[in-house]
Structures are given as structure tokens and as C-alpha cells.
């Protein structure tokens, strides 16, 4: 049951000192990340470390995307999450992966034909990302995790046991090279236009007054919690400082 959450306090986070995980996390003897090798529209690649985002309950995921809308900040958040989870093992299912620009939900199935596992989640992701054609340094959450020097000091420390990449052969996999999001746009704009771009391209909820029956459900499920009823006649934004 992942409907309830509980707060975990931890040390060493770059952005967070506490994080809310699903209650079963606190009842488990160990954490194993069972991940599928996929492309990702925002992060380019998703694997063992990104998979731990599944420990976050329901709408809290959307809240974290809203809070850390910049991809660099979201990458740091993912590293904090992996650190807090203290996952002891990870298995990567790459028998059939997902490639193309639609990942992780609307990409295309691609036969890769291998399984991989490691006690070191970053080492596993670094290796698998390399095998399908990525430069892991270009994957923001992996490069951030490497910079922390918690899982690895240097990729050269990674030791492969079992089938070599050469024996598996050249894998046909369409990587994501251009990710979506405000951060991607910022690279093409002068600094003074960044704040304007954020206002234009960050999605914001709006009431549909003609369809509204004032049930209040949208207020309950709004990830940034910025909606409220103003009076008996109409609904509008509730001003809230962004964290």
C-alpha cells in the first residue's frame, strides 16, 4: 500500500535534509531497485537511480517536479533521493527496453537482450547508459551523483563480471539527445529572457468556470497547492510563494 507516507531524515543531501517516502519503505529489510532501461524526455535516460523516484507517493511526485522544475535541481533531488533510500542492490531489465523520444511512457520497445545487476546503483546506470550509446557525463543525475563521490570516485573503478559489452554486440538504441523542459530552452536564450521563458513555458493550472461545479477536487489534487475558492461567486488562484 503506497497511499501513506512517512518522513525520513538523512544527512548529506545537497537540496534536502528530509524526504517523504511511502510507508512500506520503513517496513522493509532492504531496498532493491528493479528498473527498466528506458529513454526519458526530461532526463534523457532512466534506470536504477531514477527508478527510486517510485518511493515517492502519488501526487508528491508532481509536487517535486514543480518544486525542482530546473533539470539540474531535479537531478540533485534524484541524487538526494538515492542517498536517502540507501538502496543495497539494483537489477536492470534490458531484455526489452524502451528507446526514442517518447520515453519513459510513450517510447518504442527495443530488444536489447541482457540483464544486469549491481550493489552500486551508479555503476550499474553508468555501464548500461554507456552500452546503449550515451555519454553518462551528459546525463545530469548521473554526473551529479558521480560528483558527490559517494558511489564512485571515478568510472574507471567499475568492474564488469560476466558477459562483456563486446560479447553482447552493438546495440541498436535511439538515445535522447535533446531533452524537454525550461533548462533546455535557457541554453538558447540570453540570461535576461530566462524569467520570461519560465512564465511562458511552465504549465500552470487554470479554472474552467463554465465547467466548475465547485466540488473542490482540483484544489485537493493540485501539486503546487496554489488553487483555492476566493468567494461564493468564483474561483481563482491563491497566491503562494514558491519554495
For each feature predicted by the language model, list its residue ranges:
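Short pre-active-site segment immediately N-terminal to redox-active cysteine/selenocysteine motifs
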Residues: 210-211, 221
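Extended, low-polarity segments enriched in aliphatic/aromatic residues
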Residues: 1-208, 217
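Iron-sulfur cluster-binding cysteine motifs and their immediate structural context
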Residues: 217-238, 243
Amino acid at each position: 500500500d503506497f497511499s501513506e507516507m512517512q518522513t525520513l531524515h538523512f544527512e548529506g543531501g545537497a537540496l534536502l535534509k528530509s524526504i517523504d517516502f511511502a510507508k512500506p519503505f520503513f517496513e522493509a529489510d532492504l531496498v532493491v531497485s528493479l528498473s527498466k532501461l528506458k529513454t526519458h524526455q526530461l532526463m534523457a535516460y532512466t534506470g536504477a537511480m531514477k527508478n527510486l523516484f517510485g518511493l515517492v507517493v502519488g501526487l508528491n511526485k508532481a509536487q517535486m517536479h514543480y518544486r525542482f522544475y530546473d533539470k539540474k535541481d531535479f537531478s540533485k533531488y534524484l541524487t538526494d533521493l538515492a542517498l536517502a533510500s540507501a538502496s543495497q542492490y539494483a537489477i536492470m531489465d534490458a531484455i526489452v527496453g524502451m528507446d526514442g523520444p517518447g520515453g519513459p511512457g510513450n517510447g518504442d520497445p527495443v530488444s536489447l537482450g541482457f540483464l544486469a545487476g549491481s550493489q552500486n546503483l551508479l555503476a550499474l546506470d553508468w555501464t548500461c547508459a554507456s552500452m546503449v550509446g550515451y555519454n553518462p557525463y551528459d546525463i545530469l543525475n548521473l554526473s551529479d551523483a558521480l560528483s558527490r563521490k559517494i558511489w564512485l570516485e571515478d568510472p574507471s573503478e567499475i568492474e564488469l563480471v560476466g558477459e562483456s559489452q563486446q560479447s553482447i554486440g552493438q546495440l541498436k538504441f535511439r538515445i535522447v539527445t535533446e531533452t524537454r523542459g525550461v533548462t533546455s530552452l535557457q541554453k538558447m536564450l540570453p540570461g535576461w529572457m530566462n524569467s520570461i521563458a519560465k512564465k511562458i513555458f511552465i504549465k500552470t493550472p487554470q479554472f474552467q468556470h463554465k465547467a466548475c461545479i465547485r466540488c473542490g477536487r482540483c484544489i485537493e489534487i493540485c501539486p503546487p497547492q496554489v488553487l483555492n475558492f476566493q468567494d461564493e461567486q468564483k474561483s481563482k488562484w491563491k497566491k503562494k510563494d514558491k519554495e
